[in-house]
């Protein structure tokens, strides 16, 4: 296994090797799409299973007190989550991705990706005015970045791979075949 990883690292580290980068981008795109599909299921399944609504988008069918309780409970969970995290782990969303792309060459840390997943799922399920597209961008870029980091991809190629992850995540988020 170590030999294969060394050979793969040598293959993709060459600046003129576009085939290795294309294969890695394909893998990152598939992984990002799977992550976003699981994220959407993590949002839609609890809504349909536990709330008396017909569609995951129809919070107006809930009573006034149910909406208030749902929002309050979700807010409390999010406050406790972000208050307990160190400052460097609180970065989530599109602005975090842009900052990491600009100042850290596409290195997106895994803990921030996990926080994004959990916080966005709680916010959306509890009825906050949060869309799934912003978290999808972070989750897609983060998934691709983690794949690139695991194979030792160079900075300039890691940024390209993170962009491929974003495109795949947006495509999966909107149920479109290609971004």
For every predicted segment, state its role.
Residues 1-179:
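Alpha-helical transmembrane segments and immediately membrane-proximal extracytoplasmic
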